[in-house]
């Protein structure tokens, strides 16, 4: 089942992202999901399921393994996999998105911008979650990049697991 993300009012302390899943966000429950780009067929994954600090993320065929199942925590606005957070790492366009220990770092905070049936994930640094060179091939790295209104490599579909 696809999940769309909506931005809630800026004053909402309980949940800045709302999942269209019965009560998931309102209850503050973490939600497990796969993340696919516009056009589908691929998912973001941790290469080789190697959940270690500074490990970059990449695109791969969707397969529902633990390496592709992320958890969104609406209270912290963190996207996690294993016990690590997805981190914008550095904050410059082209920096690879990596895993790091969860904390209060701005690079670990992700908000969303609904774009029709898709969602952009925007880091607190103002850069978007992006596929390098727009490639959806296996192994294509995930990076942060300047947000654009017509960037298909920044539009994501969330599949609930």
Protein language model features and the residues they cover:
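Lectin-like carbohydrate-binding module/patch detector with strong preference for beta-trefoil
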Residues: 27-161
